Amino acid sequence: ESDFARSHPGGSLGRRLLLRVEDIMHTGEDIPAVPQGTALSQALMEMTRKGLGMTVIVDRHRHVMGVFTDGDLRRALDKEINVHRTTIDEVMTRNCATVHADVLTGEAIRIMNEKRITALPVVSGDKTLIGALHMHDLVRAGVV
């Protein structure tokens, strides 16, 4: 596989076999994240500002506790919750899918397809949030 990728780096298969998540992920201030206990209304503002269709919920050590997505928002609104009185912990998806930065983009695509999601938190070995990856990043990189 890697010989093929090195021989054909210009094609999407070659990029999928060479490009790593860390090469295209969002980092630093571009990562949508809020601490546990944040009001849902504030989490929605963070999600809107960062434009990835999700926000990651972290503890005080930046370990990933869950994720809140556009889909979670639709489900919450169906329950007619008060976005100002509800905390993100009450509506987030726990045990969310994540990906490591050194993983090939092809593996990130596989996870997104399997879980039917469009964005992933990127974590270090101890589940510390270090980035975010959206399907659009993969499209822009020519991987899909």
In which residue ranges do the predicted regions lie?
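Tandem CBS (Bateman) regulatory domains
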Residues: 1-30, 64-118, 125, 129-144
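Oxyanion-binding "anion nests"
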Residues: 23-62
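Short loop/turn microsegments at loop-to-beta-strand junctions
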Residues: 52-53, 117-119
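Short beta->alpha connector loops at strand-helix junctions that form conserved
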Residues: 58, 123-124
